[in-house]
């Protein structure tokens, strides 16, 4: 079994959902982001989703856009990011590590070179945020060559044709959107309906994780109890980073408390 299969199997046995925090590598600095990642792991993260900074992150709301800009201002490059991911992997051998990246960054590296770097660094999955499923075959094929899982986004209004397409390619997990649009917590709570979850599961047995706007324990409990395998939480964590940019000790404490609280909410048996 790969790392995703292992973690989902273990969590299922313990009757827990999977908690996946998202942060942007290099935000607010590379050293601080690595401290944050270690705090996330130490306090309940079951897997990681790490954003590679990009100048025009169209799929993301203002919170994550600003995180990308802060990271880009540090003038790090993709080679440094892969180096630090490799160091993370040496320290944390079992946690699944996924990347969220935009297509231009992959093309700039060359597909084979990019996925080879992922493999050598210990990356488990890649989600390319701006590539629709109908244009994904070249990425998926190359990812498979290097045993990297391709993660695909499933919107809440997906029709049968899209669900079928996703079922052909999805590995690791499927990223189920709480709502259409971009990331962030500006909107009211959105819950994925049980009927829609059943519909997705008709096509695929890959675990389903809900993302976009996850910011409190009610949302987490609702997601797990409705049949999803877990949640992805990004903007709420990045808001903490932004709020305490110049108070690192407080930032780390607030992130620790938040992650512990949301991870506790994934447990179906208290």
Curated annotation (Swiss-Prot):
Keyword presence, Lyase: yes
Catalytic activity line of the entry: (1S,2R)-1-C-(indol-3-yl)glycerol 3-phosphate + L-serine = D-glyceraldehyde 3-phosphate + L-tryptophan + H2O
Keyword terms: Amino-acid biosynthesis, Aromatic amino acid biosynthesis, Lyase, Tryptophan biosynthesis
Enzyme class (EC, first level): lyase
Domain of life: Bacteria
EC number: 4.2.1.20
GO cellular component: cytosol
Pathway this chain belongs to: Amino-acid biosynthesis; L-tryptophan biosynthesis; L-tryptophan from chorismate: step 5/5
Keyword flag Amino-acid biosynthesis: yes
Transmembrane segments: none
UniProt-annotated catalytic positions: 49, 60
GO molecular function terms attached to this record: tryptophan synthase activity
HAMAP family: Trp_synth_alpha
Function: The alpha subunit is responsible for the aldol cleavage of indoleglycerol phosphate to indole and glyceraldehyde 3-phosphate.
UniProt record similarity statement: Belongs to the TrpA family.
Subunit structure and binding partners: Tetramer of two alpha and two beta chains.
Protein name as catalogued: Tryptophan synthase alpha chain
């Amino acid at each position: 079994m790969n790392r995703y299969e292992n973690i989902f199997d273990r969590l299922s046995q313990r009757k827990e959902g999977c908690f996946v925090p998202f942060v942007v590598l290099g935000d607010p600095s590379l050293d601080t982001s690595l401290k944050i990642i270690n705090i996330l792991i130490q306090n309940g993260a079951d897997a990681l989703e790490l954003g590679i900074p990009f100048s025009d992150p169209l799929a993301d709301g203002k919170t994550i856009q600003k995180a990308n800009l802060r990271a880009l201002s540090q003038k790090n490059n993709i080679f440094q990011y892969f180096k630090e991911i490799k160091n993370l992997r040496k320290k944390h051998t079992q946690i699944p590590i996924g990347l969220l990246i935009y297509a231009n960054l992959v093309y700039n590296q060359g597909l084979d070179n990019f996925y080879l770097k992922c493999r050598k660094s210990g990356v488990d999955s890649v989600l390319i945020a701006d590539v629709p499923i109908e244009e994904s075959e070249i990425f998926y094929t190359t990812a498979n060559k290097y045993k990297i899982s391709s993660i695909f986004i499933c919107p809440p209004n997906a029709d049968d044709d899209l669900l079928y397409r996703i079922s052909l390619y999805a590995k690791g997990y499927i990223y189920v959107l709480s709502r259409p649009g971009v990331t962030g917590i500006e909107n009211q709570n959105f819950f994925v309906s049980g009927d829609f979850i059943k519909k997705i599961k008709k096509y695929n047995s890959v675990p389903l994780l809900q993302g976009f706007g996850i910011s409190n324990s009610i949302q987490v409990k609702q997601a797990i109890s409705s049949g999803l395998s877990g949640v992805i939480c990004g903007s709420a964590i990045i808001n903490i980073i932004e709020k305490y940019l110049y108070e690192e000790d407080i930032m780390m404490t607030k992130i620790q408390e938040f992650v512990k609280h949301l991870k506790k909410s994934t447990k179906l048996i208290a």
